[in-house]
């Protein structure tokens, strides 16, 4: 089964895909080069050119893997707990948000009305910069007056998500389409 962007385990699945793809593509490049060398006895042949050009997609896969390698997927226990405590909220998991200055991992995000809350377990993630970046992207997409808060503390994030879930239980759910668009925008700025 394919893991879609925003589902738990996405980062792990992508890392495996990129690593396997890079290894296979470099193996093909080496095989093409060796075949050309064996056939002609020289590296100056057409298959060498094909092998060199074949390095481009292989290198792209390797760069994607190297970019994602330091980051982890959300822990299964935290995923289950969030699903249990906030069933009414729209959620997304395992994101690596990219801005022009930084690459910032975000384990989970919940969306309800005009509020977006996220949890980043990586201590190198700058909470304020990530929140500002998400808010700016949402503003650029005509979602003004959004409140974006990123937490490093899982307990604080979970209590905020529970509070948002309680508010969602009381309010009518006419904003689901809007929340799905907000979630899609956040996923679009993620690797």
Which residue ranges define each predicted feature?
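Surface-exposed interaction regions that form or flank ligand-binding interfaces
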Residues: 1-92, 132, 141-146, 153-191
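Active-site metal-binding core of divalent-cation-utilizing nuclease and nuclease-like domains
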Residues: 87-106
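Short acidic/polar capping segments at secondary-structure boundaries
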Residues: 96-97, 123-124, 155
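Active-site beta-strand-loop-beta-strand hairpin of nuclease catalytic cores
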Residues: 106-117
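Conserved, surface-exposed functional patches that form binding/active-site neighborhoods
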Residues: 114, 120, 133
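Canonical phosphoinositide-binding patch of PH/PH-like domains
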Residues: 117-125, 146
